[in-house]
From Swiss-Prot:
One of its GO terms (cellular component) is outer membrane-bounded periplasmic space. InterPro entries: Flag_FlgI. This is Flagellar P-ring protein. It comes from Rhizobium meliloti (strain 1021). Assembles around the rod to form the L-ring and probably protects the motor/basal body from shearing forces during rotation. GO terms for biological process: bacterial-type flagellum-dependent cell motility. Residues 1-25 form the signal peptide.
Amino acid sequence: MKINACNWLLTLAVVFAATLTSAYAASRIKDVASLQSGRDNQLIGYGLVVGLQGTGDSLRSSPFTDQSIRAMLQNLGISTQGGDSRTRNVAAVLVTATLPPFASPGSRLDVTVGSLGDATSLRGGTLVMTSLSGADGQIYAVAQGSVVVSGFNAQGEAAQLSQGVTTAGRVPNGAIIERELPSKFKDGFNLVLQLRNPDFSTAVGMAAAINRYAAAQFGGRIAEALDSQSVLVQKPKMADLARLMADVENLVIETDAPARVVINERTGTIVIGQDVRVAEVAVSYGTLTVQVSETPTIVQPEPFSRGETAYEPNTTIEAQADGGTVAILNGSSLRSLVAGLNSIGVKPDGIIAILQSIKSAGALQAELVLQ
């Protein structure tokens, strides 16, 4: 029953992936490419989270937190000389955010905070004013607000219960943009579209779709595929650049991708693309289970003797071999490949080993990606 359920889930996952691949073969340019001049930028800052209920940094173990508290209070005009703080209501954190392209001053961003010291939870805390800088050292945003933590941590004298991560959280709309990134979009004459998944077929198809649009609107070609990732678009003399990009990004093109099998060995996840093919190959799979159990026996000394209580080790080892079924795999289609794998009756971890062996044998006509 468990094998049938496992097979059904694998079939459902792979067929669902194939359905998505077919459904999204035709996509808008905005969904598969982005402007080279309109990329995201990473911001980072160092700050303090206050208002924690005794779950912050211990100042002896995290001296940088103590230094930061004193520096913050001095900036606020409060003298800290001669004082010895023992609070655990403050935590030092790193604050990160992503600055989107064309973001204007006054806009807001979500920020992520993560503990640097030995704080046990950031739940209920408030991030105080923290400047966020880019790779050039310039300050582009300032963050402040209540920290939202998804996990929880509760403990007593003899037990502890935790779920999720409590030492990291988010501040929704917690950062205000103070500086605009320099952009040459309005003054540019040549724009470059970058494919998120590089592919020569998709790049050539994108250039052809843009040229068909340009021939109808401007009477000439304006796009050229530079390589598998980049498509150059030249602005016509009388065209408005914003209007041109609005029309171009809504053009529908046929996308393509190489055959690929993605395997995550930690979680047992397997994703098989629609174009994956397997040459005819025979596969035999068997599992060996070894179980070692320890049941020590307590030996008591005789009454009124000088002996001591001792124990005798008792080890039991059991080995069981399962499987050994031979199946012929010939993946002329995704459905036949999944049916062949399910016929062996193995679990996802076994299928991972089988796919790796088929690739080593040269029968898997696809790229094998291990995560």
